[in-house]
């Protein structure tokens, strides 16, 4: 693992050359992210502005891949709310965990089959059930479905809106493979969640 000061130095050099304006870290622990920005402050360097981890309503129980980190943790959410640093979430819809159960199971089976040629025996796949299914997340899904009924949308829309509705700048990366997947995701942009709903969905 490279020292954080080396990253900050190189990224500041790129900024000074006019190649970038802001920068951040992907799959960094909050401790490492803080360390980098503290070093930047002490050395009159520009800080990292963006943390790029997984931030989904469902908390990861197994990493999508080795080194993948979740920002749905109280310490990280508090830090982002206090500092107003931006967050760009990968797998922001938890790989389809909040879709109808039948569809989620189909996605799980498809991903498991496609990864079987290179996964080690006994190693979990990166499917939605392998990485997100837990008692707490099933309760989050139940609450998302209940709120979706009240707002006239899908639970998946509620989950995506949860990521976008944080009290800090929060952006969601999505990977639709069909026009229909895109069309059924975009309604999340019209949903507004208040802080009480955000906390309730996340079991806070």
Which functions belong to the PLM regions below?
Residues 1-203:
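Beta/alpha (TIM)-barrel catalytic core signal, keyed to glycine-rich beta->alpha loops juxtaposed to Asp/Glu
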